[in-house]
Amino acid sequence: MARFALTIVRHGETRYNKEKLLQGQGIDEPLSEIGFKQADAVGRFLSNVRFTHVFSSDLIRAKQTACAIMENNKISEDIKIIYDRRLRERKYGDAEGRPLSELKVMAKKAGDQCPSYTPPGGETLEQVRARAKDFFEYLCRLVLEESSAKEQSELGASGMGGVTSADLGPFVNHNKEPAELGESRDVTVHASVLLVSHGAYMRNWIKYLVEDLQFTFPPELKKSRELPVSPNTGISHFIVTVSSATPRKPEIQCVCINLHSHLSDINADTSHYQV
C-alpha cells in the first residue's frame, strides 16, 4: 500500500481567458500580466509544501505557472518539472480562438449544449476523461513502484522524502470556509505530487474520480463545487491511498476543491467561466 498527496493547480490567466476566448490546444497563449501575478501568488501559497514530483501540461500557460510555483518553493529540492501532453487542455478544434458564446451557438445548432458538445476537430468529453484516467493510473503505479523499491531497500517511507503533515502545511493548518476546505488530519505520505493543468481538463478529472472511482465529497464540501471550472490558479488537493492488490480502485480523500483565497489581493475576476 502507498499513499500520496495530489495537488492540482490550474494555470494563470491569459489574454484569451480574460476575453472569454477558447484556447484548447491550438492556441498556445502565454500568461497575461495578471496571470503572472496569480502564478506568483499561488507559488507563495504553496511555498512551504514539499513536492517530490512535479508534472505540467506542455502548453506555455501551464509551463509558466509551474515554473513560478517551483521558483517560490522553499523546501522542494532538485525537482525537475516533467511536461506531459496527457495534461493538456481539451481540444476544441474549429472553435479554438473563438468566443465561448460562439461555441454555445454551435452547440445549439447541432441540437446539443455545452460542455457535452464536441466541435468539428475537437475532443469528446470521453476522450478527455480517458487521458485523465491514463495519467492518474500512471501516477498510482509510479508511487506504488517507488514505495515498493524503497521498502525492499529497507529505507522505508522516509527514504522517499518523509513527507509529513508539516510538509503539507497550507492544507493541514490553513483555516478556510467549510465549503472550500474539508477536514484534514495528520498524515504521512510516500510522495507529494504537483500537477499544473487546465480548467476543462481538471473538471473532467474530478468527474472521473466521482463517476468512475465512486469518490464522494465529504459533507463539509458542497458537491456543487464539482461542476464549475476552476478559477485561474485554483487549487484542488487530495490524499490518495492505493493498494497493490487493487491499484485501479484507490481510496481518495478530498481536502479542497478550486481553492482560490490566494487571489484575494489580485485584481482578477474569478466569478465567470474561464476556459
Swiss-Prot record:
Keywords: Apoptosis, Autophagy, Cytoplasm, Hydrolase, Mitochondrion, Nucleus. It is an enzyme of class 3 (hydrolase). It is found in: Cytoplasm; Nucleus; Mitochondrion. SUPFAM superfamilies: Phosphoglycerate mutase-like. Its EC number is 3.1.3.46. GO terms for biological process: apoptotic process; autophagy. Pfam families: His_Phos_1 (PF00300). Its main location: cytoplasm. Belongs to the phosphoglycerate mutase family. This is Fructose-2,6-bisphosphatase TIGAR. It comes from Xenopus tropicalis. The gene is tigar.
